[in-house]
């Protein structure tokens, strides 16, 4: 199968994917001692989350908003997290992957409404669910939670893993100096695609394997693999999820990847990889 697109089309696709976002409505329920049900006020915080970014990139602005609410006594060192239908969201996964895996199955034909999430604030009565989602272990000078440092550390670890799969060694990323590594990781927050591509290309010397994660429907199970770059998408899915192939839809960046089934993983990865250099595929049961 030939290349997916021309160079110009490839650049435009990458730009659109980089800037792709999801509308979020975050419900903030403030618990007070005066009311019978324990809830004094409920606030809505509307925002946009980049598909290929991570939930904690939104947290500093959310915290600033919470601090301005009249009924909140917010502690700087209290971490926050988001839940969907009572389940804490794993912030180390891209926002778009969470959306495609958890929300899209019920809204595939109607995605006009924002994704509604519940905000939680850690306290003595509501501990942070560190047994389920990655804890935040860094603090800023003022004692507040340093979400940015946790994101950068997580992304660096992910990049090391994908670098090893791609090159057969993690040396390319280990050879970056400290400022280069920090800049590369921070670009998910600063959103400079050109600079990200420049530094990311420095750690991709050759492609021996493609890092792929397949998220299965109605489960937390994930099929992870280092995949032959020349395998077709349909052959990969037949190999990994043979019983679901005929009754499911593969989703990449919120897009039906059915038309890509006869393309090689190498071509698909080049256009649709996330900033951690992983190709994420969510399996949807229509």
From Swiss-Prot:
Domain of life: Eukaryota
Subcellular location: Preautophagosomal structure membrane
Keywords assigned: Autophagy, Isopeptide bond, Membrane, Protein transport, Transport, Ubl conjugation
Keyword Nucleotide-binding recorded: no
One Gene Ontology MF term: Atg8-family ligase activity
Record PTM: Conjugated to ATG12; which is essential for autophagy.
Signal sequence, start to end: none
GO biological process, one term: cellular response to nitrogen starvation
UniProt-listed InterPro entries: Atg5, ATG5_HBR, Atg5_HR, ATG5_UblA, Atg5_UblA_dom_sf, ATG5_UblB
Cross-link Glycyl lysine isopeptide (Lys-Gly) (interchain with G-Cter in ATG12): where in chain: 160
GO cellular component: Atg12-Atg5-Atg16 complex; autophagosome; mitochondria-associated endoplasmic reticulum membrane contact site; phagophore; phagophore assembly site membrane
Lipid bilayer topology: Peripheral membrane protein
Assembly behavior: Conjugated with ATG12.
Function field: Involved in cytoplasm to vacuole transport (Cvt) and autophagic vesicle formation. Autophagy is essential for maintenance of amino acid levels and protein synthesis under nitrogen starvation. Required for selective autophagic degradation of the nucleus (nucleophagy). Also required for mitophagy, which eliminates defective or superfluous mitochondria in order to fulfill cellular energy requirements and prevent excess ROS production.
Similarity annotation: Belongs to the ATG5 family.
Protein name: Autophagy protein 5
Gene: ATG5
């Amino acid at each position: 199968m030939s290349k997916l697109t021309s160079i110009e089309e490839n650049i435009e696709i990458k730009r659109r994917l980089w800037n792709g976002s999801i509308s979020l409505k975050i419900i903030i329920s403030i618990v007070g001692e005066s009311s019978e049900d324990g809830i004094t006020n409920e606030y809505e915080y509307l925002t946009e989350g980049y598909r290929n970014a991570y939930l904690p990139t939104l947290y500093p602005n959310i915290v600033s908003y919470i601090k301005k609410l009249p009924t909140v006594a917010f502690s700087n060192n209290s971490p926050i997290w988001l839940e969907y239908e009572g389940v804490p969201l794993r912030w180390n996964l891209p926002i778009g992957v969470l959306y495609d895996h958890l929300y899209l199955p019920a809204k595939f034909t109607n995605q006009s409404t924002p994704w509604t999430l519940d905000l939680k604030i850690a306290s003595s009565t509501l501990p942070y669910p560190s047994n389920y989602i990655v804890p935040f272990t860094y603090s800023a000078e003022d004692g507040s939670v340093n979400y940015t440092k946790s994101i950068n550390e997580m992304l660096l670890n992910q990049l090391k893993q994908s670098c090893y799969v791609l090159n057969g060694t993690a040396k390319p990323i280990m050879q970056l100096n400290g400022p280069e590594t920090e800049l590369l990781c921070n670009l998910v927050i600063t959103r400079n695609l050109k600079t990200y591509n420049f530094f990311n290309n420095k750690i991709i010397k050759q492609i021996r394997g493609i890092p792929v994660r397949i998220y299965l429907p109605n489960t937390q199970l994930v099929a992870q693999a280092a995949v032959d770059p020349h395998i077709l998408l349909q052959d990969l899915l037949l190999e990994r999820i043979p019983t679901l192939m005929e009754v499911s839809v593969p989703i990449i960046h919120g897009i039906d990847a059915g038309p890509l089934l006869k393309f090689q993983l190498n071509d698909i990865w080049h256009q649709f990889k996330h900033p951690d250099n992983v190709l994420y595929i969510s399996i949807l049961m229509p």
